[in-house]
């Protein structure tokens, strides 16, 4: 159940009225909500903006008419996301509710990792935490609420919509995906669930990678086994399908390759009913892999490949995805969809491919925050695709041995994050949406593995 304000206040003190938004400042904190404005003119966004019909309703920023109600906008295995109003400035934001965090040690560690990552990220194409709601006293601490930027839609909804996608759209989307992925990989982080639904998009075509529930730091020791319960099947790399106990950042690149093909063809590239069928579809396209490409595969998967008929590659069919599947596009796509992960292109090298030159130019001409315009022209940043300033540190996880220990650390972490920042917020139990909010939950927690994650 959602906590009813900070543990240092009584629930009845939280709200002067019966209604109000789902989040609010604690007792005694008042904020002025500006009327806002539509913003000044500027360079039109290119490529052409996506239609509002694909997007979440926009906040009424001019102060007129009925305010937009707080409402759920997304559900996942590890949380629920609501669209709410930040009472400190009147802006619409996304509120992620992480329920039942402290059920077991694996769940605790996973949520703590995701929380630390969201606070670590500093990149325009990676979703990060804007704020964390004030926790109650530790005895009542069961749920975590994270505020992030509110995006209008996701790439899956764009792909399945009737919205035409030009070459400009595809290039600027792919550029941003790889730009964000280069940053994550430079921090030593594997996303492990790159798919269109985890790529948030605004109508101006700005894109952010989200959902780090399965993300973890790359394991450099190849003797350490890693979980195979990662990546949605359609976007799962062949080394995972073949039972590899160790993998690296190349698994994310494979997923991006599948998404690239999906943007070109407007359909899922490898859509199978089972992991074995998924592997068969991959070899239908790429051909039978050499033994060296199956070095990390389990014996059963290797035997399945070898006892089947030898398949020649049929990569020429990629040109039939659409009229946008040019030679440069297919060349880059083939570098991403290599069976051997050691030969698969990296995010850094993919960004240097000629196919993405136009995407880079369009993004930095009118979409990014790292470049700016002056009267004499455009001032460009010295580094178009920045890396993380340091690697994400997960060494603390080795010392986590109990649920209560993690609970104390998470509580302290959230409290420390709020020091010196904006006035804190908490859940408003008197809001019209509160009853619906406390009933909204993630997918059934029993479906989430309790095995130790690696």
Curated annotation (Swiss-Prot):
InterPro entries: Kinase-like_dom_sf, MAP_kinase, MAP_kinase_CS, Prot_kinase_dom, Protein_kinase_ATP_BS, Ser/Thr_kinase_AS. The active site is at 193 (proton acceptor). Its EC number is 2.7.11.24. GO terms for biological process: anterior/posterior pattern specification; mesoderm formation; nervous system development; peptidyl-serine phosphorylation; peptidyl-threonine phosphorylation; positive regulation of protein ubiquitination; positive regulation of receptor signaling pathway via STAT; transforming growth factor beta receptor signaling pathway. Negatively regulates Wnt/beta-catenin-signaling during development. Plays a role together with sox11 in neural induction during early embryogenesis. Involved in TGFbeta-mediated mesoderm induction in early embryos, acting downstream of map3k7/tak1 to phosphorylate stat3. Augments the rnf138/narf-directed ubiquitination and degradation of tcf/lef by enhancing the association of rnf138/narf and tcf/lef. Phosphorylates mef2a to play a role in anterior neural development, including eye formation. Residues 67-356 form the Protein kinase domain. Keywords: ATP-binding, Cytoplasm, Developmental protein, Kinase, Magnesium, Metal-binding, Nucleotide-binding, Nucleus, Phosphoprotein, Serine/threonine-protein kinase, Transcription, Transcription regulation, Transferase, Ubl conjugation pathway, Wnt signaling pathway. Activated by tyrosine and threonine phosphorylation. It catalyses: L-seryl-[protein] + ATP = O-phospho-L-seryl-[protein] + ADP + H(+); L-threonyl-[protein] + ATP = O-phospho-L-threonyl-[protein] + ADP + H(+). GO terms for molecular function: ATP binding; DNA-binding transcription factor binding; magnesium ion binding; MAP kinase activity; protein serine kinase activity; protein serine/threonine kinase activity; ubiquitin protein ligase binding. Coiled coil: none annotated. Gene3D superfamilies: Phosphorylase Kinase, domain 1, Transferase(Phosphotransferase) domain 1. ATP binds at residues 73-81, 96. It comes from the Eukaryota. This is Serine/threonine-protein kinase NLK2. It is found in: Nucleus; Cytoplasm. Its cofactor is Mg(2+). Interacts with sox11, hmgxb4/hmg2l1, rnf138/narf, stat3.1 and mef2a.
């Amino acid at each position: 159940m959602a906590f009813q304000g900070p543990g240092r206040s009584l629930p009845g003190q939280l709200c002067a009225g019966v209604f109000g938004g789902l989040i609010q400042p604690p007792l005694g904190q008042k904020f002025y909500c500006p009327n806002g404005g539509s913003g000044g003119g500027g360079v039109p966004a290119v490529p052409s903006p996506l239609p509002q019909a694909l997007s979440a309703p926009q906040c009424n920023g001019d102060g007129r008419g009925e305010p937009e109600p707080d409402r759920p906008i997304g559900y996942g295995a590890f949380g629920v996301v609501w669209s709410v109003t930040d009472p400190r400035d009147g802006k619409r934001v996304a509120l992620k509710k992480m329920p039942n965090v402290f059920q077991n040690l694996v769940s605790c560690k996973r949520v703590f990792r995701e929380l630390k990552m969201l606070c670590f990220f500093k990149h325009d194409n990676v979703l990060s935490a804007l704020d964390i709601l004030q926790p109650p006293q530790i005895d009542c601490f069961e749920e975590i609420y994270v505020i992030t930027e509110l995006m209008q839609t996701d790439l899956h909804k764009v792909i399945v919509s009737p919205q035409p996608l030009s070459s400009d759209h595809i290039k600027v989307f792919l550029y941003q995906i790889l730009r964000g992925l280069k940053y994550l990989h430079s921090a030593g982080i594997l996303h492990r669930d790159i798919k269109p639904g985890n790529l948030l998009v605004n109508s101006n075509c700005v894109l952010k990678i989200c959902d780090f529930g399965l993300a973890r730091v790359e394991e450099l020791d190849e003797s350490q086994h890693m979980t195979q319960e990662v990546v949605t099947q359609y976007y799962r790399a062949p080394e995972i399908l073949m039972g590899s106990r160790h993998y690296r950042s190349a698994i994310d690149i494979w997923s991006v390759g599948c998404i690239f093909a999906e943007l070109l063809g407007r359909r899922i590239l490898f859509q199978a009913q089972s992991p074995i069928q998924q592997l068969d579809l991959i070899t239908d396209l790429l051909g039978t892999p050499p033994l060296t490409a199956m070095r990390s595969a389990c014996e059963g998967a290797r035997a399945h490949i070898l006892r089947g008929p030898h398949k020649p590659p049929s990569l020429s069919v990629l040109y039939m995805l659409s009229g946008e599947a040019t030679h440069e596009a297919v060349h880059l796509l083939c570098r991403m969809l290599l069976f051997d992960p050691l030969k698969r292109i990296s995010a850094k090298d993919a960004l240097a491919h000629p196919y993405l030159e136009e995407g880079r130019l369009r993004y930095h001409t009118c979409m990014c925050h790292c470049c700016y315009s002056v009267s004499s022209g455009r001032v460009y940043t010295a580094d178009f695709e920045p890396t993380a300033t340091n690697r994400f540190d997960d060494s603390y996880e080795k010392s986590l041995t109990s649920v209560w220990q993690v609970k104390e650390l998470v509580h302290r972490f959230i409290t420390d994050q709020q020091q010196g920042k904006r006035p804190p917020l908490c859940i408003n139990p008197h809001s019209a949406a509160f009853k619906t909010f406390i009933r909204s939950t993630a997918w059934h927690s029993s479906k989430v593995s309790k095995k130790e994650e690696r």
